[in-house]
Amino acid sequence: MATDWLGSIVSINCGESLGVYQGRVSAVDQVSQTISLTRPFHNGVKCLVPEVTFRAGDITELKILEIPGPGDSRQCGDLQQADTGIPGVGCQVGPSQNGTGKMLKKPFSSSAPQNIPRRTDMKNQDIIISPQQQCSKSYMDRHMETLSQSKGFRRRHNSWSSSSRHPNQVTPKKSGLKNGQMKSKDDECFGDDIDEIPDTDFDFEGNLALFDKAAVFEEIETYERRSGTRSRGTPNEKPARYRHDENILESEPIVYRRIVVPQNANKEFCTDSGLVVPSVSYELHKKLLSVAEKHGLTLERRLEMTGVCASQMALSLLGGPNRLNPKNVHQRPTVALLCGPHVKGAQGISCGRHLSNHDVHVILFLPNFVKMLESITNELNLFSSTQGQQVSSVKDLPDTPVDLVINCLDCHENAFLRDQPWYKAVVDWANQNRAPVLSIDPPISEMEQGIDAKWSLALGLPLPLGERAGRVYLCDIGIPQKVFQEVGINYHSPFGCKFVIPLHST
């Protein structure tokens, strides 16, 4: 009796923990009380193993989905422990319709097996089934029945709203030649029954490997070349139309060395964009400023331009808009400005005036001298009109660290100032304050007791500064291009859209 069920397609429910398995019966062992399925599916997903074996104790419900062989006579009923080794397991069959369209149910004894009629006979007679355990139709019949029901649901879907509101009204059927033609077209497209369901999945990778994409693309390209048309995705071809931000003309090669000095530079720098900026000697730089002054770039203009560029750099070093905004008025940055009695000191005073105008607390140190330069006197008169503080003694400088120290103590002409007591005291204070130092136009020579700067700002063209100058920046003080040419420098501005740019050592 157990061998009669071999080849049947069944569905085994093993409870919530193990789930539902479907497959074809390959073996039924009455001794060990097991049943085996080949090509199993677990909860609708194909299993990786070719065969699965179940014990009778794990099975909650067993349903027969399809009995093999349309001409074979199979028996279906309660599979008793003596026959199949699986006690209390039945099979289900979908309801068969008789002449009245109703399903007849009749309980039967679980001790006696019951014959299952042939498929041809099942269509014309009612099946006597158990009220709790039912034998289902074949898998193909149930699938076709589902398709027919779904078709009927689609046809009735459009009249759902009217029928639900007026249940007694019947929607009139549309008639006419046009509707009949449409119905026949629908039947031609959707009315065919499914003859067979393929058992194997479609091999996408294998069929994709058969497609020679290179040959197809070559054929398309050859056809388009002959017909004169061009595809948008064809490589190595320029588009016929350009976007609004594209240049039609080919750009010339980039020249990175645009500044040429008459003598070999001891040191070269480069900008962020890669432009080479050579350094110049102190004598050439002094000559450049002298010629510019003859052309109208006076000392007052140069001091003003230097003060603006240096203050812009200092403001960015202090934090820029993140530090200097109305929400931080209680945290004004403090800058200590150390100036000597020379032109470079006047440049620092001009920078301090602009910083004070931008709500920065500036403490200006300038030693007392009997006679001052006119440029220093003029800058001090302007600085005194601001809220900045001027001191002449190191004792008046703050004991706590400041936000920034601006160094304008050194120059090339007055080297003897380094031996003065006030100079040494100021240098010691700056080194002990532990604040970052910005040097404006520092000299070339290394000083024994100088202040190590973190940043240095050069004017026009940089000098060959040493390592103690820190990171070098370059500012534009407005020297015309013809002035550079007059001193023998082939010059092209490296600043772009900025007045202060960083330089990198090459």
Curated annotation (Swiss-Prot):
SUPFAM superfamilies named in the record: YjeF N-terminal domain-like (SSF64153)
Annotated region (Disordered), positions in chain: 99-118, 149-188
Compartments, as annotated in UniProt: Cytoplasm, P-body
Record region (Required for interaction with DDX6): 189-294
InterPro entries: DFDF, FDF_dom, Lsm14-like_N, Lsm16_N, Sm, YjeF_N_dom, YjeF_N_dom_sf
GO BP term, example: P-body assembly
Domain YjeF N-terminal: 281-485
Protein keywords: Cytoplasm, RNA-binding
Boundaries of every DFDF domain copy: 190-226
Origin: domain of life: Eukaryota
GO cellular component, one term: P-body
Start and end residues of each Sm domain: 1-68
Pfam families cross-referenced by the UniProt entry: Edc3_linker (PF16598), FDF (PF09532), LSM14 (PF12701), YjeF_N (PF03853)
Predominant place of localization: cytoplasm
One term of GO molecular function: mRNA binding
Keyword Transport part of the UniProt annotation: no
Region of interest (Required for P-body targeting and interaction with DCP1A), ranges: 1-79
Keyword RNA-binding: yes
Function of the protein: Binds single-stranded RNA. Involved in the process of mRNA degradation and in the positive regulation of mRNA decapping.
PANTHER family membership: ENHANCER OF MRNA-DECAPPING PROTEIN 3
Domain comment in the entry: The DFDF domain is unstructured by itself. It assumes a helical fold upon interaction with other proteins.
Homology family: Belongs to the EDC3 family.
Name this polypeptide is given: Enhancer of mRNA-decapping protein 3
